[in-house]
Amino acid sequence: EKMRLSAQAAAAEVIHAGSTGFIDAGSYFMEEAAKVYAGSGLRGALSYSTMDQAGLPESIAMDAGTAVQKTDELYEGFHGLGNLKVYYSLRSLISCSEELILRAAERAKEKQTMLQAHMNEYPGEINFYMERKQLRPYEYLDSLGVLGEHFLGAHSLHLSEQEIEILKDRKV
């Protein structure tokens, strides 16, 4: 019920602002949001929130397989309904294992849809990858081979010159 009400409020706000489309980074109970958005007339893309790192609250903890399966179910039920598309999502890159990143990217390619992630939002995210991988976030994803025209990097605030070149070269 809360998700339905939230989606109704969000759709009304988007319409009131004069926009005709949106991309929702994802949450839980997205089936309820999809029903609202499909009936709103808006063009949009939505995702299931996927994270699989240890230490997440029990209410949202899942493994990579379950995370991808949840998006598969959302895709099968709502992709193409009205003006909706379903994208695969890496909710917070630092909360996603390499396995989840690779599985979500593979599935997005199979389904010919987008893979989206919040990227380079704050210095701590960049430091996290520099300390663990000696790579910046986009460099890390590039090393995994998941970047391309099918990838949507939201925010992308703190980019290095090398990351900008990667984005250009991979047509992100």
Each model region followed by its residue ranges:
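Metal-coordinating catalytic core of metallo-dependent amide/deamination hydrolases
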Residues: E32-L157, Q162
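Metal-associated gating/positioning segment near the N- to mid-region
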Residues: E1-A34
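Short, surface-exposed connector motifs at secondary-structure boundaries
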Residues: E13-G21, G82-Y87, L144-H150, K168-V172
